[in-house]
């Protein structure tokens, strides 16, 4: 049925992509039937997520996505945040909001640059994983005020 490496067989890849998407679709329908919004923290960039973990999240019907754009995990600088956000926003094409999920220790030394990369490439907002200190939260508030961005 499969070649010696099923993970490289396109029919197996499609099976995995479809299986995960079907589960997400069932959950999404149940949540939305109850009048609630639904979101998920997903792997970064739709193309990377498809390849790495078989998440075809660009085709899901969620209200918001929080791609985990942990640039340090992939040995990338803050510019990678912008590229990942841009791909994500383009893929969802206005159907949902994209909030860049940032690993705080990865961006601590390039805090404002990382935020610029997210917002300048279309992120509706950001979420912090392994959260910032109060000092950085104050810097974040000042950044939002300076850029004329509202807080929700």
Residue ranges and their predicted role:
Residues 2-62, 68-75:
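Polysaccharide-binding and catalytic clefts of secreted carbohydrate-active enzymes
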Residues 61-152:
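Substrate-binding cleft of secreted/luminal carbohydrate-active enzymes
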